[in-house]
Regions:
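Acidic-aromatic substrate-binding/catalytic surfaces of carbohydrate-active enzymes
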Residues: 63-145, 153-154
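Short, structured interface segments
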Residues: 13-37
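Short aromatic-acidic-glycine turn motif
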Residues: 84, 184-201
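Short, exposed beta-strand/loop patches in secreted or surface proteins that constitute
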Residues: 43-45, 52, 130-143, 157-161, ...
Length: 243
């Protein structure tokens, strides 16, 4: 890898510089943290396990595909008003922990046998759900936005990540929702789930997640944590906590 880096440098494809120089360039070009995305649709063994990260200064989300099954593995909102533990004093341990405000946390809320996530489901006549297999995604970058489209048999599924919001649409004749499930026994931050907002508290910090389009429904039987129901076939989640 070092040989290849040197070769690319000599060819003008790679610039070698110090972190100070990189930081100065970044600050000059981006006064505010820009939106970024990272896509990896095959794992190291070329298995059809894919992951897409989208990050802005307001939130981050991770979308996972395991074969043809999709889930939001991670949706965390950022609040610049919350000071990190290391803002005014140095860290003295061997690890640093930076807290963000979760709507979905596939790492902390999962177990070896149950993967937490927000999944696309069809609502059955008895109120139960069936996960819809979305198939593999088509990915398009459009300015600061990321647009993801899937074509399951049940309709057209679209996710649009913008800097301040998540937009999800499913053009289908099925009754559908996004359904959050977690492993049993996990401590969740949600204090109150109402139609248009979730009141939550994490690490001593209260926050609210609002649905600009669609509504939240809490489970009444423990089969899931909550559902986000669409309005006119779409859901919009406001990811700006500073409003």
């Amino acid at each position: 890898m070092l040989f290849r880096s040197a070769q690319w440098r000599n060819e003008g494809r790679l610039r070698v510089e110090t972190l100070t120089e990189s930081g100065r360039w970044f600050k000059q070009n981006f006064p505010l943290t820009p939106a970024t995305a990272v896509t990896a649709m095959l794992d190291q063994n070329d298995n059809p396990v894919g992951s897409i990260w989208y990050n802005s200064r307001f939130y981050r989300t991770n979308m996972m595909w395991t074969h043809n099954e999709f889930r939001f593995r991670d949706i965390h909102l950022f609040d610049q008003r919350i000071e990190s533990d290391y803002l005014k004093k140095a860290g003295t341990s061997t690890q640093c922990i930076y807290m963000t405000m979760p709507l979905v946390d596939g790492y902390m809320w999962s177990s070896n046998s149950a993967w937490a996530g927000l999944r696309l489901v069809e609502i059955q006549s008895d109120g139960s759900s069936r996960q819809i297999k979305t198939g593999r995604p088509e990915i398009e970058e459009k300015g600061s936005e990321l647009i993801i489209k899937c074509h399951p048999a049940e309709g057209e599924f679209t996710i649009r990540c913008t800097e301040q919001a998540l937009y999800i649409a499913f053009d289908s004749d099925k009754q559908w929702a996004l359904e959050l499930t977690t492993a049993t026994g996990k401590q969740l931050p949600f204090n109150q789930i109402s139609i248009d907002a979730i009141k939550a508290e994490f690490n001593g910090h209260p926050y609210s997640i609002e649905a600009v389009r669609g509504n939240f429904v809490a489970s009444d039987n423990g089969a899931y944590v909550l559902r986000i129901m669409p309005s006119d076939s779409a859901i919009t989640i406001d990811c700006n906590l500073s409003r």
